[in-house]
Design a protein with these regions (language model features):
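Terminal helix/beta-alpha structural elements that buttress the NAD(P)+-binding lobe
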Residues: 1-231
Length: 231
């Protein structure tokens, strides 16, 4: 297949009017940009899909697709990661920045597939608490000041989407050695303390969680097509 002038593609593009790419092998579904300068990033970020070959693509929803697909895709990968690791034996997950779209998507998927098996707690600001409760994505919604209200004694995963070192430290101080995994996903609190600002936290050491790594796992196991259909 050839790339035809006028073809619309989906992928991660620079904020610019133009970009020069070097396509590798072109398939019915899309191509990969093989420029040397792009070799330092995970392969997923260099892949571009032809929208005409995308299942479920609709031109009238392009803006929504551009906004929500990467975010919900991350939510899906978070859930997949949890399943692959059997939730590290935990029965509860705490998600920070519960009003963020990625957190909402993750909460929705957990409620859909694991309601009653894995408890989810969404942490948010006081001003957003009522909104988040109305989403019905989490079993419990608490504000950041209410971390001391989380019952102790249950093994609990942490997915930190806020990127707020103080909030993570408060969670670790509260839950301690019942935290088998603590993953940093995003940074919606862009002006908060940097990752790792607090050292020697009780429980599992916070680590960066990687969506591209989980993509690689799924592609190896079920292939790209099946992964996209599941998503």
């Amino acid at each position: 297949p050839d790339i035809i002038v006028g073809d619309r593609i989906y992928g991660f593009l620079p904020i610019a009017s133009h970009v020069t790419m070097i396509p590798g092998e072109v398939s019915h579904g899309g191509f990969t940009d093989t420029r040397e300068c792009r070799a330092v990033v995970p392969p997923f970020y260099n892949e571009y899909a032809f929208t005409k070959a995308e299942p479920g693509y609709a031109p009238e929803f392009e803006e929504a697709i551009m906004l929500f697909r990467p975010l919900f895709g991350t939510s899906f990968l978070m859930q997949s990661y949890c399943e692959d690791h059997d939730f590290y034996g935990a029965k509860r997950i705490v998600v920070t920045s519960a009003s963020a779209k990625t957190a909402m998507g993750f909460g929705y998927l957990m409620r859909k597939h694991f309601s009653g098996a894995i408890e989810t707690i969404g942490l948010t600001s006081s001003k957003n608490k009522a909104f988040v409760e109305g989403l019905d994505c989490y079993d419990t919604v608490l504000t950041y000041d209410e971390v001391p209200l989380i019952p102790v004694g249950t093994d609990t995963l942490i997915f930190d989407i806020a990127g707020n070192a103080d909030v993570v430290a408060a969670l670790h101080a509260r839950l301690g050695n019942t935290i088998p995994y603590s993953g940093a996903v995003g940074k919606t609190h862009w002006n908060a303390g940097a990752f790792g600002a607090h050292r020697d936290l009780p429980g599992a050491k916070p680590v960066f969680w990687s969506a591209p790594d989980q993509i690689a796992v799924l592609r190896e196991r079920i292939g790209s097509g099946a992964m996209m259909r599941q998503m």
